[in-house]
Amino acid sequence: MSTGDSFETRFEKIDNLLRDPKSEVNSDCLLDGLDALVYDLDFPALRKNKNIDNFLSRYKDTINKIRDLRMKAEDYEVVKVIGRGAFGEVQLVRHKSTRKVYAMKLLSKFEMIKRSDSAFFWEERDIMAFANSPWVVQLFYAFQDDRYLYMVMEYMPGGDLVNLMSNYDVPEKWARFYTAEVVLALDAIHSMGFIHRDVKPDNMLLDKSGHLKLADFGTCMKMNKEGMVRCDTAVGTPDYISPEVLKSQGGDGYYGRECDWWSVGVFLYEMLVGDTPFYADSLVGTYSKIMNHKNSLTFPDDNDISKEAKNLICAFLTDREVRLGRNGVEEIKRHLFFKNDQWAWETLRDTVAPVVPDLSSDIDTSNFDDLEEDKGDEETFPIPKAFVGNQLPFVGFTYYSNRRYLPSANPSENRSSSNVDKNVQESLQKTIYKLEEQLHNEMQLKDEMEQKCRTSNIKLDKIMKELDEEGNQRRNLESAVSQIEKEKMLLQHRINEYQRKVEQENEKRRNVENEVSTLKDQLEDLRKASQSSQLANEKLTQLQKQLEEANDLLRTESDTAVRLRKSHTEMSKSVSQLESLNRELQERNRMLENSKSQADKDYYQLQAVLEAERRDRGHDSEMIGDLQARITSLQEEVKHLKHNLERVEGERKEAQDMLNHSEKEKNNLEIDLNYKLKSIQQRLEQEVNEHKVTKARLTDKHQSIEEAKSVAMCEMEKKLKEEREAREKAENRVVETEKQCSMLDVDLKQSQQKLEHLTENKERLEDAVKSLTLQLEQESNKRILLQSELKTQAFEADNLKGLEKQMKQEINTLLEAKRLLEFELAQLTKQYRGNEGQMRELQDQLEAEQYFSTLYKTQVKELKEEIEEKNRENLRKIQELQSEKETLSTQLDLAETKAESEQLARGILEEQYFELTQESKKAASRNRQEITDKDHTVSRLEEANNALTKDIELLRKENEELNERMRTAEEEYKLKKEEEISNLKAAFEKNISTERTLKTQAVNKLAEIMNRKDFKIDRKKANTQDLRKKEKENRKLQLELNQEREKFNQMVVKHQKELNDMQAQLVEECTHRNELQMQLASKESDIEQLRAKLLDLSDSTSVASFPSADETDGNLPVGSACIPYLFIFYSSSSRIEGWLSVPNRGNIKRYGWKKQYVVVSSKKMLFYNDEQDKEQSSPSMVLDIDKLFHVRPVTQGDVYRAETEEIPKIFQILYANEGECRKDIEVEPVQQGEKTNFQNHKGHEFIPTLYHFPANCEACAKPLWHVFKPPPALECRRCHVKSHRDHLDKKEDLIPPCKVSYDVTSARDMLLLACPQDEQKKWVTHLVKKIPKKAPSGFVRASPRTLSTRSTANQSFRKVVKNTSGKTS
């Protein structure tokens, strides 16, 4: 600024800076600065500094007054909490005075300072305050106190798009609309120079009309001149983050606005499919899919997504160098996906949204989730011992959209101001607020009327469309009627033809019967006449042949007659149906004509009404002019009243200043007097105390110092007199001050009288204002009524015009259709006459084709018989195998029944033993002889127990033998199957090779014929006869070649069908075998459980067999009591069972968890759907304990989709793919190209990732996470070890080798959820003990010989499924 400017221009510039809301030194910013200083300095430790104390004593009271006058949280009443985040919450509030509804966002100052990110809210405030865009949520006010920042925004009652997607299946039409609105909203933010970086459905809100607005600009960043951003932290939500933003972590991140278009592609995919494109349960999985987006982006087959939508998604979800939108928003707008007939880019905001929220009131929160109360303690700033400046980062945050202080100065008005009461200003402000509220309500009514007008226009469009559809339907029906009539005529003609044929056939039949009868007569005559001659015999045979031929002809004729009768009946039925259809169509035509006549009548009536309304409209326009004149006069009166209000306000301020000055003087005098009185009283009390002390001392001393005492007493009396005189002077001063106070009271009464006079004036003004407001309301109501009537009349007139045009168009179209139909009818009659001759020719051809069809049927029958013979052979083999299988299963059942019977017998014996032991205890005191007898019985029972254990061992051996036999039978069955398949394959290959040789021979033969010299001779020299012969030979060869090709194709189809059938049988056998293996595993676990129970029972009986301590006087053998406890520990530790939850369909976010009953035996881990399946021994999945690799509790990074309460209850197991056995085997495609993003180190396969939630490095035990700026991290996808990336980059030897040594492509992991947290620990500790110390052999050597029989069977089964799926596709 130049110093040569005048003071007025400088002051004007300063004034502009103070007024400018975007200035760093505006009035709100200066007030924030003073407020922050007072907050930060007002602590006991800081007030010890004299300068700080003086500053606070000077400004604290005024700052407190300013705090009361400025906007604060108490000005609003909270309706409901509608959102909660990391820094605070969002409340639905209502302003107490204006009664307007807002959404108020609270941000905790402590949380933002604590997380060292206090700058992100500035972008959010500036974008919402200064955007001035219909696509951005508007900020009305921003204010603060010592704990929170407050942002008062417009309330969006439609909720967010997450709520909409959860309530509706979004069609492509809706997705197009919302994607277009998001594109325009992002373009508005980009045009302001910001990048959003967190575009997701949670930040897309819907207003009351259903249109979209963007919110939550906390991650926004200002672009440089080149439209780029430099950032070294990955910001955003994992599912929607782009690859270039993800790569920026720990490096030099440099990217532009194209990162927002990536998020738009993810959002569009989620709307159409229902899930994000790179969904994974763990954060590492999501990030690895995003980095490998070229291979991991797929579309589901069951969703009908258009090519344009897929093209747009692929154009968004690609590398940033070629991403759509990099060169501007116009190339996105030009995409074919956005082409439609319902809206244009310029009128998108004015069109009706697909979903308009149904709201019951202005505080309807039905589209927001109900949140629980936050019961956690709120953290605040601790009391500092030195200056910290916690409030300084928030200076200048305050913002008001309609700032009212610092008005334009007018010296004449300021000089004429006088004393006025504060109540006058408040009452006038209330009236202004009421008027503003009325204006707001009027605006709302206007919006509602506009919305109703839009909806009525939509309804009208729908009605017009329906009318068009009805007209089209009518035309279609008329065309259908004409078509049906044509078909009816054709059918009638066919019926007549068939009747004629039937009559002809009947005549032929009669002739044939007559001929047969004559032939019979001749035959009888010949038999009688010439029995001896050979000629007669020959004639007889000839006649018999003729008779047989005649009989055959008769049969065929009868069959054709039956067929013709059937066709005749069918034709008659179809004719009746067509007639009924014709009647229905005629009725509909009559109804349409009636509706047309009614519409004509309504049109004429509405035209008459319209003319009447036009007459009334002229009269209403005159009334509107008068009302407008009256409104302008009322507005001038309101301005005059406002002017009076300002004048009265200035007078009130002066009076208030005078009162404040007098009160200050009075208070100062009172303070001085009180201070002097207190000092005098203190001095007097001190003298009295000293006098008492001296008196006590003098009483104890000798009489010789009485004179000194008298002298001291005199001095004390003098001092007392002086003090009394001083007290009298102080009392006089008090009296004088009281006189002054009485004078001030008189002045106060006079000022009160003036105030009463002013209140009377105020009441008069209020009455005038009320009368004026009533008049204004009446006039506004009249105006609104007239406007609504005019709108309805205009709307009805437009409707009538539209109906008139539509009816005219329909009449014209009907006339044209009638002409066309008449023309078509004439042409059809001509065609009908020409078609009669063609029908006769076609009938002859049909008879010839029937003859050929009989020949083909005989050939088909022969082929079917051959196929049936082969199927019978295959069925016979399958039945033999099934019989073998049934015999084995019956043997196994017999063994199980034996074991159960033995167990029952053992139970009976145990019960008897228990009764006997009880009797022995009771009778022990009575008779020792009885005790010895009982001991004998116990010994017998022990012998029986030993015998039973031997039997059980024998049964176990038999069971093992049966298992071995089952395995051998399976192997034999497999070998037989393989041999059959190989034989069939060889046979097929032989057939194919023979067919190929024949084909090649035929081709070679043709080539030889074609390459003969005879063909190369000139055509003129060639003989015509030779050429004809060669042409005949060529035709024959061509026919033979075609026949051979047909045979070859038939053979290929036949063999392919047989191969498919065999593969299907193999699949069924494998599934059946899989189920048997699972049942066998469950039976083995049950047998193991029964053995453990038997051991427990035997141990308890052995313990019970020892005499009690009373009987033996405590003399037990050493070590006898220790043996049973060992067995009990073994039985309890080898088995664990209970309810666990597994991910439903592999997607926790969408489908949640599925409960299963899990049993862990010594060899297997069995999963049952319920306890009934457990009783029936039918598990849904079985895992081999030998194939387990790793068991561990999960962290938040492994299952970031799960709830925070569930994470301590979840654990993960890693196992070999071959160790799994399911009911429904799923063949998963192996993804290629995924290993390229891994970093190998000490057997680990590290994936680069980021942690925004608590996690620690397992190498250095330091934090590995941060909410906004997490450090670069690595996680092994084998053993899930987490580490800083620096350890690997600096080649530090801190990371231990990978504990899991298996191939990830042939291994699986599973998440399991235990209900209590303690249960999770039990399961993990138990399963860790079960893991084998050495890795499974199949994974160490990777040789096919070491694999188990079940794994090979599963692999062969998967190959078969792949082959069948490939061939069927």
UniProtKB/Swiss-Prot annotation:
Residues 949-1015 form the RhoBD domain. CDD domains: HR1_ROCK1, PH_ROCK, ROCK_SBD, STKc_ROCK1. Residues 998-1010 are annotated as: RHOA binding. It is an enzyme of class 2 (transferase). The modification Phosphoserine is found at residues 1105, 1108, 1343. It catalyses: L-seryl-[protein] + ATP = O-phospho-L-seryl-[protein] + ADP + H(+); L-threonyl-[protein] + ATP = O-phospho-L-threonyl-[protein] + ADP + H(+). Its cofactor is Mg(2+). Residues 422-692, 1011-1102 form a coiled coil. Residues 1133-1332 form the PH domain. SMART domains: C1, PH, S_TK_X, S_TKc. One of its GO terms (cellular component) is synapse. GO terms for molecular function: ATP binding; protein serine kinase activity; protein serine/threonine kinase activity; Rho-dependent protein serine/threonine kinase activity; small GTPase binding; zinc ion binding. A zinc finger (Phorbol-ester/DAG-type) spans 1243-1298. Residues 707-946 are annotated as: SHROOM3 binding. Protein kinase which is a key regulator of the actin cytoskeleton and cell polarity. Involved in regulation of smooth muscle contraction, actin cytoskeleton organization, stress fiber and focal adhesion formation, neurite retraction, cell adhesion and motility via phosphorylation of DAPK3, GFAP, LIMK1, LIMK2, MYL9/MLC2, TPPP, PFN1 and PPP1R12A. Phosphorylates FHOD1 and acts synergistically with it to promote SRC-dependent non-apoptotic plasma membrane blebbing. Phosphorylates JIP3 and regulates the recruitment of JNK to JIP3 upon UVB-induced stress. Homodimer. Interacts with GEM, MYLC2B, RHOE, LIMK1, LIMK2, TSG101, CHORDC1, DAPK3, PFN1, PTEN and JIP3. Interacts with FHOD1 in a Src-dependent manner. Interacts with ITGB1BP1 (via N-terminus and PTB domain). Interacts with RHOA (activated by GTP), RHOB, RHOC and PPP1R12A. Interacts with SHROOM3. It is linked to May play a role in hypertension. Rock1-inhibitors lower the blood pressure in spontaneous hypertensive, renal hypertensive and deoxycorticosterone acetate-induced hypertensive rats, but not in normal rats. This is Rho-associated protein kinase 1. The lineage of its organism: Eukaryota, Metazoa, Chordata, Craniata, Vertebrata.
